[in-house]
Amino acid sequence: MLLKFMYIYGIGCGLMPAPLKKGQFLLGYKQRWYLIYTACLHGGLLTVLPFTFPHYMYDDSYMSSNPVLKWTFNLTNITRIMAMFSGVLLMWFRRKRILNLGENLILHCLKCKTLDNRSKKYSKLRKRVRNVLFQMLLVANLSILLGALILFRIHSVQRISKTAMIVAHITQFIYVVFMMTGICVILLVLHWQSERLQIALKDLCSFLNHEERNSLTLSENKANRSLGKLAKLFKLFAENQRLVREVFRTFDLPIALLLLKMFVTNVNLVYHGVQFGNDTIETSSYTRIVGQWVVISHYWSAVLLMNVVDDVTRRSDLKMGDLLREFSHLELVKRDFHLQLELFSDHLRCHPSTYKVCGLFIFNKQTSLAYFFYVLVQVLVLVQFDLKNKVEKRN
């Protein structure tokens, strides 16, 4: 049900390469109508673009006397527009590639679904995935709602200009938020399949350990079944890794610009928080509460992104490596099984799942924490710059 909601949001925002029906992308006549709708939607986003930077925000708002607030406002808008354009261009120039990726992802999910035997382990996994997916959709909707409430609280006598600015910002915000949520959902689905593979590998290890304790030899039938299952799991794991790499390659530029947008928004939010805390900006208790929830939703979204990327890269490899080591003590299995196990281990060792953003830096939990620390440093620099301006004005 939650995946259906995400699909509806993706179709509504023009973020799908084509509509889906019974697990297959619709092409031809029906796709043509969807392309027309997407073109109109993207045309609308371009039409409202000039209203993103209204004059009254610089001359007749709370930031009119603070150059740092104007600078962060401009930078936040520019990075959001850049992220939005990266998504728009991706949908038009790489549509076939995204279609192929979507078809391969659906096929991979169907293969991994055959491993799910409705046992307690798989039920717990489904609940865990459902919980994360619910959080992603909740945070996306909450971020849009809170962003709209904050925009409505900005006072201005120019009502038409203010309304146009709110429409421009909300439409851009909806597009960017669901673009990031869509990428997170794709990675979450791949992580779900990886977890299914790990459960199946654990079950195979438990079965062989049971045979090791209770039998002197492993029958030909059981040996062949075990070897076949290990080979199947290895093939599915390699396919899962390939799809993860393909997702990162396809969405590399949008992810990089979304991370840049998150960084700038982070600086903007923390700096606003400092200004509100010092009572430099006049505000009501209602605006203060909404602002606090904006900060919470932003960091919640950042943590979800950080966790899902870490799950499909570093953590997935560590878990799989630990599971493969549990097979090392088995003695009843045949030489072919050990060779297949060695092949699995070599593949894992030679193809580590890491994500380099545009080939510049590895994105994982460690770099994310360093990024949060760097934001605080940047805000301290901005506060010092702000204090320097105040001293110069007094003199």
Curated annotation (Swiss-Prot):
Of which family is this protein a member?
Answer: Belongs to the insect chemoreceptor superfamily. Gustatory receptor (GR) family. Gr22e subfamily.
Originating gene: Gr58a
Gene Ontology process terms (BP): monoatomic ion transmembrane transport; sensory perception of taste; signal transduction
Transmembrane residue ranges? 33-53, 73-93, 132-152, 170-190, 251-271, 289-309, 367-387
**What domain of life is recorded for the organism?**
Eukaryota
Q: Where in the cell is it found?
A: Cell membrane
What's the main place this protein lives? membrane
Question: What GO CC annotations are associated with the protein?
Answer: axon; dendrite; membrane; neuronal cell body; plasma membrane
Q: What is this protein called?
A: Putative gustatory receptor 58a
